[in-house]
Amino acid sequence: MNTEVLGVIAQIVLMVVLSYPLGKYIAKVYKGEKTWSDFMKPVERVMFKLSGINPNEEMNWKQFLRALLVVNLFWFLWGMVLLVTQGVLPLNPDGNVGQTAHQAFNTCISFMVNCNLQHYSGESGLTYFTQLFVIMLFQFITAATGMAAMAGIMKALAAKTTQTIGNFWNYLVLSCTRVLLPLSLVVGFILIVQGTPMGFDGKMKVTTMEGATQYVSQGPTAAIVPIKQLGTNGGGYFGVNSSHPLENPTYFANMVECWSILIIPMAMAFAFGFYLKRKKLGYSIYGVMLFAYLVGVCINVSQEMGGNPRIDEMGIAQDNGAMEGKEIRLGSAATALWSITTTVTSNGSVNGMHDSTMPLSGMMEMLNMQINTWFGGVGVGWMNYFTFIIIAVFISGLMVGRTPEFLGHKVEAREMKIASIVALLHPFIILVGTALAAYLFVHAPAFVESEGGWLNNPGYHGLSEMLYEYTSCAANNGSGFEGLGDNTWFWNYSCGIVLILGRFVPIVGQVAIAGILAKKKFIPESAGTLQTDTVTFGVMTFAVIFIVAALSFFPVHALSTIAEHLSL
């Protein structure tokens, strides 16, 4: 047990220590300063020339958003065509068939919004061609989209008064070539050394210890897993994600993959401080996020290492903790750490089954996604926190009788309305979706039965499964309580709608707020200026997040996860 705890501590220390220099590097990349990766400039110039794009052309916030939305629409259409027709495309040695229209709709939107919700099993639901030219492609593009949006916001906030927020295409390419690609190559090499397969052979025929014949999928796993983790994507190459021994072969590989989930979201908080030359503000934001993350880690590690009371009642020893749904080679503590790491971000990959974690662990996993501001997805996680900064600044200003200001710009009714809509949309789409599913399950049993029954675990846990699904979609996370039968017409389409709303409405709102603030007259700091880089303001922001985001969900948790915990 002590060794497992030391492993958890070592992983967290590595994340914290390495996120600082990475954040400094990312800030330099977006500011156009000299870095070690400048050797990529010729490649970038060729890409821009072939695309007919001038990377130095400035965009206002509306042009920036137009480019972002148009390119995502194009990739959605691209993905839909390939997923439906994958059965007749090359690189399909196992003969996997094309996806149905509603499954392709869900899959394509899911990967386009950086969620990677999977209503299919990775090795049988896709071909090598679509793994590379839809899944891996989207995992780079969507991660870079979030990072580009944050870069635009940073540029807007760094300027005293400006009409433009940078060039979306430039930020998109820089995010891929300077950050995501180099880190993916390093992580991919480590995984190959640890035993993750990399090739295009078909299924491998093996004889098990019992003498039976089994066919094991292989493919370009080591190419896809790194960006799956680093881009907070999370979509597993194999159906059981990183609990699969070929996707996550060893404890060291597990450490590297877990580190990969959080390193860029952590670094982005530091990058904000370096970009704006307000390191203290970056430290403050990072500190609040880290505190919330560590609280979750402590709760889940304690819950999972403590074992299941029901098994204790049977007189069965649980020296290794609650091991249902976990891998022996990884242990309960490493699985608990991963469960929090993957849900404080929009990653959603798993190295054990969240459906089998203890009820309070499941509640923490859902609360992380329901709050959706602790580190979050690459770029968009900080942007969600930015929404609550605007709300906290406005409330704080009213409380002390000062005009609300953030970084020298007045926060007025227009920005507050946008921030409020963004903040309230998240709980709204989660709770409405869950309520609709619960209503249909009770009042339309014939429809539910025609779709396979949906729930394998009715009662408290069944409600938790439906709540988790919509929570994961709205937070663009992608993990799930897999007792839910979700590859159906209803779940594919309803989740697809929640995915779109949960991704693009916040991005549009947050970029709009930054663009509107940037155009306002700059107000120099004075003795009456609200200091946003203090511990006091950090606590205020934490309180606003907890009240607005977390408390909205406690009634439904009382009927699901908490009720299940009390029934043990």
From Swiss-Prot:
Keyword Cell inner membrane attributed: yes
GO MF terms, alphabetically ordered: P-type potassium transmembrane transporter activity; potassium ion binding
Entry keyword annotation includes Protein transport: no
Cellular compartments annotated: Cell inner membrane
Function according to Swiss-Prot or TrEMBL: Part of the high-affinity ATP-driven potassium transport (or Kdp) system, which catalyzes the hydrolysis of ATP coupled with the electrogenic transport of potassium into the cytoplasm. This subunit binds the periplasmic potassium ions and delivers the ions to the membrane domain of KdpB through an intramembrane tunnel.
PANTHER family recorded: POTASSIUM-TRANSPORTING ATPASE A CHAIN (PTHR30607), POTASSIUM-TRANSPORTING ATPASE POTASSIUM-BINDING SUBUNIT (PTHR30607:SF2)
The name this protein goes by in its record: Potassium-transporting ATPase potassium-binding subunit
Organism: Phocaeicola vulgatus (strain ATCC 8482 / DSM 1447 / JCM 5826 / CCUG 4940 / NBRC 14291 / NCTC 11154) (Bacteroides vulgatus)
